[in-house]
From Swiss-Prot:
Gene: ppc
Superkingdom of source: Bacteria
EC number(s) stated in the UniProt entry for this protein: 4.1.1.31
InterPro entries: PEP_COase, PEP_COase_bac/pln-type, PEP_COase_Lys_AS, PEPCASE_His_AS, Pyrv/PenolPyrv_kinase-like_dom
Names of the cofactor(s): Mg(2+)
Cystine connections: none
Name the record gives this protein: Phosphoenolpyruvate carboxylase
Residue intervals passing through the bilayer: none
Organism: Acinetobacter baumannii (strain ATCC 17978 / DSM 105126 / CIP 53.77 / LMG 1025 / NCDC KC755 / 5377)
Keyword terms of this UniProt record: Carbon dioxide fixation, Lyase, Magnesium
Similarity annotation: Belongs to the PEPCase type 1 family.
MF-aspect GO terms: magnesium ion binding; phosphoenolpyruvate carboxylase activity
CC annotations in GO: cytosol
Reactions catalysed: oxaloacetate + phosphate = phosphoenolpyruvate + hydrogencarbonate
Amino acid sequence: MVQQIDAPLREDVRLLGNLLGETLKQHAGQELFNQIEQIRALAKGARDGQAEAEKQLEQLFLELPDEELLPLTRAFSHFLNFANIAEQYHVVRSRRQAEFDPDANSPNPLVHLFKKFKDKNISTEKLFQQICDLKIELVLTAHPTEVSRRTLIQKYDDINACLSQLDQQKLTPRERQNALANLKQQISSAWQTDEIRQHRPTPVDEAKWGFATIEQTLWNAVPKFIRELNELVQDNCQQNLPLHIAPVRFASWMGGDRDGNPNVTHQITQEVLWLSRWQAADLYLRDIENLRWELSIQSCSEEMVQAIGSPHPEPYREYLRATRERLKATRHWLAQRLQGLEADDSNVIKSKDELLQPLLLCYRSLIDSNLPEIANGQLLDFIYRVNCFGIELLKLDIRQESGRHRQAISAITEYLGLGNFESWTEQARQNFLIQELQSKRPLLPKYINEPEGSLIGHPDVQEVFATMRTLADQPPESLGAYIISMAEYPSDVLAVLLLQKEAGIQHPLRVVPLFETLKDLDGAATTMNTLFNMHWYKQHIQGKHEVMIGYSDSAKDAGFMSANWAQYRAQEELTAIARKHGVQLTLFHGRGGSISRGGAPTQQALFSQPPGSISGAIRVTEQGEMIRFKFGLEGIAMQNLEIYTAATLEATLLPPPEPKAEWRELMNRMTDHSVKVYRQTVRENPHFVKYLRTVTPELELQMLPLGSRPAKRKVSGGIESLRAIPWVFAWTQIRLMLPAWLGTGAAINEVIADQQKATLDEMLQQWPYFQTLIDMLEMVLSKADANIALYYESHLTEDEDLKVLGNQLRQRLKDAVETLLTLKDESKLLSDNEVLDQSMQVRKPYLLPLHLLQAELMKRRRDYLAERQAEHTPVDHALMVSIAGIAAGLRNTG
């Protein structure tokens, strides 16, 4: 089965593996290379069911001295990263090859979708208008799941470029030899580079990483994507897309997300906002230099002559000179501000239109001069970029927890002698907030709200006020939404609006409640209905609203199935409430990479939403390592832009069917049972927390410098205080994958036992939501491995209570697999997804040694800490590499 993988991909994996082997022999010695080959052979035997091979492997690691564990861990980790590189490049290669074959299916999902629209009699006018109205926004977030250093990511990109060069058909022998030498050099450089950051990245570092994603891939991918889309529209609708088209835009939380992250302050937010504008100005300056070089032509319109003031031999260059100087002035001003210096901002570009209008005049002039081929060259790409990225590159969302806003309002009411706002009833809070929002006077004397004044309240409260003042100083286009995490009540939304008013924000950020626990999801529609019934609020929103659905915390709270169904119901109810009030609703999906945090293939995920919930507009977070997997290469970035566009169009114009009443009834029954089973284990079993902390690397994960955000919301506390990302990450590392299946398998099994399989079969055949849920469950179960989880347990604990719990969990995992196979009438997992199955089979001989090494490293580290009360650096380093390597091998962290 492993041999069925595409030959070019297999050749690339073999080439990278061989070059890594040569590098190891050269830099680490023949002995290490021989040892790695021995381990790899034993691991392949273990994969193929040879119990003796696995025993030999376990014994080998037990006997190795500390200093030999790190190079072994690094070698297997590197191979898995190289396998990822080969797979990503193969996607790009396959797309290119399909274009050479007229009989091949197009890799662009929009091509197939347009045919489907034609078959379904969707009019070209309706399709064209819907494409023009698309509002897809992808929000890059810095959740700590990207374990690879940026330094190594750059080297991986260089390796990718080498593979691309070697694929060229007409390389001379010398060129091929040079390309191979370059590839070996990059692999050698990667081996000589430490995989682990020495320090946690700051929020500014994270923001720069987001800017780099734009610069390196999306800057070119976006205009290429829009050109392809326009060609399809020309072919199918016989029209050109308007120049202002921007179906997909980008925003960021990096530098704006302060929920549980004390490192994100108002100063950091200001720095990131300036950096973002500086990066945009720098990129546009490069573009305008190239554009002026191209536009050396003489022919121009009368409008252009008038704009210049007199005829000129090179009118476009002359006309764009002022825009170039303004971009230089903008970049200089921002550089000065970043250094803490004042500077003249009179020539600074402060809005998208100031940059766009000169470009549009050039475009009109070229068209009027019968030069469309030049108008539709670099200039059109420039226009597309400005419409997509604006002057800010990435709009910055602000996120803060609802309790901080309540504290801030309480500080105000107590200062004014009105009592403690937090102790008031919800109705009293709403009455006060609406009254003050309608008032024309400020709540506080101006000096109270100034940095040099006698600020009121706790430092956390002062930081809320300072953040609001910072937002008041920004160009409106730089800012996105203000997200309220842990939103519960209508007053949570009103409080943020009042704080913005009090800070003097002339163009208030739209306020987006994030409903994330099971209880809050169930109450989301009621909360929004209350707000929509308020006359002042209804006028304020002007017929548009955004609501964010949280996936991570609800799944940690109630388990995958219950959370998933609660999210579905909440979206249905919110859509109905918005429709009732005549409000255009945009749902913002806070998805992660793992299914426990809402991860799923994009097209499946969007098409499985409730009918009507995606009406041409959607926001989605792209988190951590998923940014690199989806947008790290230009070809893959193009593919994902196509997928998002196709999925949004299909969900809008051909929404899935309404679920039948009996389907809903069965889902309600299954989720009730699922949450009960899940919470009995996670909340009620007295040994569960100890099991998590003993058998998984949950505690060790906290030492890995992944992101700027702490792993816990609070310093102390149990499961409830642990963030959803390390929660999922810990179970993934030991391959138990517990958050995704615990409770779900038991719930499905219960209804099958009750003779309900026929209904489940119908749901699986006819309901995209249920199909996606089961597909995602199967994918995660295929990555689970009870034997590996058992090895961690037997290696790390002698506690009989924990062993009993471990046996129960592994039995439930086995039951979940059997239940899924029964449901799908299959004999093995992934029988209908050979690509993923083969990918996992190839990775197993490299993953197994890493798991065995990690368990041994965890044991040694804990023993050292118990005996010496000090850290042991070689073991710590190897342990961190093992965590990163397993994450790479599974293509999932949190």
